[in-house]
């Protein structure tokens, strides 16, 4: 006999920010820069994560250069900024693999939360990033430990190809 117990809480039901998030496009060539546009009618704190085709997650923001991402009311924010490291992706390095489907996950809150506790920051190289990445199940478990009713979560899928 298997018994399951769960606490089910709808996301954003107690004041999750009305965040608008979108990628510059839905399809990218390998290593082509990815841009994320964010906008909210209220002051919003944001964490941004990359969810790879291998089901591994790393944190893009906040990071060493940008300790806090805040969207001011009614103002649009484009990331990364010109002076920040670019966000890029490529298909998994498996022989014959020409494309993958991945996603950027945006977690928004009306107040600061410990975004760094959800996943480690992307590294300075692919090898370093892969060693830091954690399985999607661990990321989502850590995310659920926060009050999901006060969060807004946007999943921005894209296709990356050679």
Task: List where the protein language model places each region.
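Secretory-pathway glycoprotein ectodomains that are cysteine- and/or Ser/Thr/Pro-rich
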Residues: 1-162
């Amino acid at each position: 006999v298997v018994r399951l117990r769960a606490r089910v809480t709808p996301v954003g039901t107690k004041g999750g920010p009305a965040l608008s998030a979108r990628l510059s496009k839905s399809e990218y060539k390998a290593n082509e820069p990815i841009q994320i546009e964010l906008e909210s009618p209220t002051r919003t704190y944001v964490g941004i994560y990359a969810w790879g085709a291998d089901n591994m997650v790393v944190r893009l923001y906040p990071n060493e250069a940008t300790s806090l991402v805040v969207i001011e009311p009614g103002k649009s924010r484009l990331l990364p900024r010109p002076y920040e490291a670019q966000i890029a992706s490529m298909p998994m390095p498996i022989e014959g693999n020409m494309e993958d489907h991945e996603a950027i996950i945006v977690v928004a809150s009306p107040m600061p939360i410990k975004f760094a506790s959800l996943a480690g920051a992307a590294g300075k190289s692919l090898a370093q990033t892969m060693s830091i990445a954690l399985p999607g199940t661990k990321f989502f478990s850590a995310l659920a430990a926060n009050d999901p009713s006060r969060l807004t979560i946007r999943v921005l899928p894209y296709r990356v190809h050679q």
